[in-house]
Curated annotation (Swiss-Prot):
It comes from the Bacteria. This is Glycerol kinase. The phosphoenolpyruvate-dependent sugar phosphotransferase system (PTS), including enzyme I, and histidine-containing protein (HPr) are required for the phosphorylation, which leads to the activation of the enzyme. Transmembrane segments: none annotated.
Length: 508
């Protein structure tokens, strides 16, 4: 009797690593999770030790096997999904990183990004990479490491150093240095990759003086990249055959295969991605153009809007203001509110993301009266998440010319029914919550499984992650627009407040 086969997804996130084993029905059979330390050398800097990331991945692979009694030989293929943009540079011979991994949120390279803007490169970089110039992306992080580690530039030019985002680093480690690759979705977040020509861009590399020899080969999101070295996978030589950045993996896990399909992951922040098909559409409204996924010789482009504060606004109510004891409690408080929704919280704690990209804005509250209760405040904070999502969805409709009919949702805060209902109401469209909320890991598993024939084709996947619950809009049009206009006024006032503060500082 042949043993049952499975797919393993490695989900390497910002604060923890997970390994999840899925069966042929797309069900989670086993999982293991391990946190690793965050390093904050200075205010605004965020780094990771790349070896600690690797150790945590080794640990969770073992944990998933131990929990399930599944053997490495029963794993048909491995899919990898990862925190995007985070940058590792290591020695090609020894495999030792020459500096900590610089994490996507880290602002230490902001002066390099600022200089690129001042030198007038915004348009060129946007047209080639689909991105805005920002410290968020890998390009400035590589430049910073080459500038700050003695001798690094010279070693890079001699071909002694390799660069990779976390997907590349993990494949390199799992294959014991045999394979140096990345995938379309991760390459598209480096600010070095021409997403139209599908090549590393020589003009941008020259501008930043980054040697091309450092860069990994770019492959599709679903193909066999290499096999695990037996001693790194507990005796198994298993194909690594699926790879995607976390938000693109969630798009795939949500089965958003058609142009116009949109998913939103309500995590710490909120990441909204729309499949725009084989057309690369540059945003005129500060959304990012990126690659959703490339499979079977075809690339699917996407528009992306990032909201910095979503689930973390609920954590703020819990940890900062002590208004609630647990995050799920926010739903009961919001339902107990008797206000007429006249309170607005603008959670711009670290600035405003898409479509505003206002890094100076700070949080504010409007519409308070003597009658405002804790319940009203909690409700307004939850509603702020939904309002921000509408800001992005409205912008996507303008940029793409596509009428969005449904939003597919996942992530922790998607479990809040009150928030999902209000999201449906304020957008005026259906919200489809996935039955399996592990969409990021599932997306990586699907990509890996397709490459080795574990699942026959993309149609076979459509049965595997059906909608768990559908929330339909029930608010009347005039109320919906009145509430949203109030939100737009609150955002405007927030921005004016900071601008005036900046003007006061300049006058001193």
């Amino acid at each position: 009797m042949s043993q049952e086969k499975y797919i393993m997804a490695i989900d390497q996130g910002t604060t923890s690593s997970r390994a999840i084993i899925f069966n042929q029905k797309g069900e989670k059979v086993s999982s293991s999770q391990k946190e690793f330390p965050q390093i904050f050398p200075h205010a605004g800097w965020v780094e990771h030790n790349a070896n600690q990331i690797w150790n945590s991945v080794q640990s969770v692979i073992a944990g998933a096997f131990i929990e399930s009694s599944i053997k490495p030989s029963q794993i048909e293929a491995i899919g990898i999904t990862n925190q995007r943009e985070t940058t590792v540079v290591w020695d090609k011979k020894t495999g030792v990183p020459i500096y900590n991994a610089i994490v996507w949120q880290s602002r230490q390279t902001a002066p390099i990004a600022e200089q690129l803007k001042q030198d007038g490169h915004t348009k060129m970089i946007h047209e080639k990479t689909g991105l805005v110039i920002d410290a968020y992306f890998s390009a400035t992080k590589i430049r910073w490491i080459l500038d700050h580690v003695p001798g690094a530039q010279e070693r890079a030019e001699k071909g002694e150093l390799l660069f990779g985002t976390i997907d590349t680093w993990l494949v390199w480690k799992l294959t014991d240095g045999a394979v140096h690759v990345t995938d379309y979705s991760n390459a598209a977040r480096t600010m070095l990759y021409n997403i139209k020509d599908l090549t590393w861009d020589d003009e941008i590399l020259e501008l930043l003086n980054i040697p091309k020899d450092m860069l990994p080969e770019v492959k599709s999101n679903s193909e066999i990249y290499g096999k695990t070295a037996a001693f790194h996978f507990y005796g198994g030589e298993v194909p690594i055959s699926g790879m995607a950045g976390d938000q693109q993996a969630a798009l795939f896990g949500q089965l958003a295969f058609e142009p116009g399909m949109v998913k939103n992951t309500y995590g710490t922040g909120s990441f909204i991605i729309m499949n725009t098909g084989d057309e690369m559409q540059l945003s005129s409204n500060n959304l990012l153009t990126t690659i959703g996924y490339g499979i079977n010789g075809k690339v699917h482009y996407a528009l992306e809007g990032s909201i910095f504060i979503a689930g973390s606004a609920i954590q703020w109510l819990r940890d900062g203001l002590k208004m609630i004891e647990t995050s799920p409690e926010s739903e009961q408080f919001a339902l107990a509110s008797t206000s007429d929704d006249e309170v607005y919280v603008v959670p711009a704690f670290t600035g405003l993301g898409a479509p505003y990209w206002d890094s100076n804005a700070r949080g504010s509250v409007f519409g308070l009266t003597r009658g405002t209760s804790k319940e009203d405040f909690v409700k307004a904070t939850l509603q702020s998440i939904a309002y921000q999502v509408r800001d992005v969805i409205d912008t996507m409709q303008v940029d793409s010319g596509i009428d969005i009919q449904q939003l597919r949702v996942d992530g922790g805060a998607a479990m809040n029914n009150m928030l999902m209902q209000f999201q449906a109401d304020i957008l005026g469209i259906d919200i489809a919550r996935a039955k399996n909320l592990e969409t990021t890991a599932l997306g990586a598993a699907f990509l890996a499984g397709l490459a080795v024939g574990y699942w026959e084709d993309m149609d076979a996947l459509k049965e595997l992650n059906a909608t768990g619950q559908l929330f339909k809009a029930s608010m009347n049009e005039s109320r919906k627009e009145k509430l949203y206009k109030g939100w737009k006024r609150a955002v405007k006032a927030t921005q004016v407040f900071t601008q005036e503060e900046d003007a006061d500082d300049d006058a001193k």
